[in-house]
UniProtKB/Swiss-Prot annotation:
Protein name listed in UniProt: Uncharacterized oxidoreductase YDL114W
Binding-site residues for NADP(+), renumbered to this chain: L50, D90, N117, Y182, K186, I222, T224
Source species, domain of life: Eukaryota
Family: Belongs to the short-chain dehydrogenases/reductases (SDR) family.
Cystine bridges: none
GO molecular function list: oxidoreductase activity, acting on the CH-OH group of donors, NAD or NADP as acceptor
Enzyme class: oxidoreductase
InterPro entries on file: NAD(P)-bd_dom_sf, Sc_DH/Rdtase_CS, SDR_fam
Pfam families attached to this UniProt entry: adh_short (PF00106)
Keyword Oxidoreductase on entry: yes
Keywords, sorted A to Z: NADP, Oxidoreductase
Active site location: Y182 (proton acceptor), K186 (lowers pka of active site tyr)
Amino acid sequence: MVRKNKINRASGTTKHLKDFPSVILSLPSYNPSILSKNATALITGGSSGLGFELAKELSRRINKVIVADIQSFPTFAQVEYNNIFYYQCDITSLDEIKNLKKAIERDHGNINIIINNAGVAHIKKLEHMTNKEVEQLIDINLIGAYRIISTFAEDMIDNREGFIINIASVLGELTPARLTSYGASKGAMIGFHKCMSRHFRSLSTECNKTGIKTLLVCPGKIKTNMFIDVPTPSKLLAPDIIPSQLALAIISAMEHNHLQTLNAPYYVNLVPFFKTLSWPYRHLLKHFSGMDHVTSTSPRAINPKRSA
């Protein structure tokens, strides 16, 4: 069942974008940004964390923001934003996503921007994970994003315009202890995004059918509830990311038509180099960084937590 709530709007203030590559924030734009148009965005997992910050910031720049989440939108925000619209939707259900599309088309028209942000994490040894837990995690973190794109992208292709953003994680490239299933889902998201982007580019060059832009976001540890009980092993080398700052960096990348990968903070850009090292050196790196220790000693409950 899709349930809609209307959220009221408030004005915002400019925040400083620290810990992000300045080149991304100052790229020249040779094509008009989709944010300069009468756009409507759909954000999954937008009731908290990064998704909530993206919803607030986008509401100040575009016509409408649609939040689709199984969790309710925060009560305190319901009196502050008038162009954010909440729909309750479980992205593991294709029927609910199809009903969501019908409701959005009826109430708001077509979607121009998709941000796949919804996600869950289990901090458990792989052998202690049940099949149901693994299936649920993959269903939300990967297949749910596929369902959203396959359902809404057809209109983007017909209109020859759109922007799709997939939120992955550096843990899809280098995974610490007890996050095997989560790392696998985010690694699969990275691979899916690359294949999807090539597909849309081929449509554009071969058939002139689409102007869909894509952006992959690979952040480090974001300071949200998902990993709230996992301490940062090194605030100097791998600082937590403030969700509001990452949201602004993503929007800046959209404004400048940055169409590759947004890595944040700086150390994420070094991960491809780490992956070229032989396994003994990777093992030593993970040991001295403390990343395995903080996840293996986390008091995390078994139940998953939604939203990045």
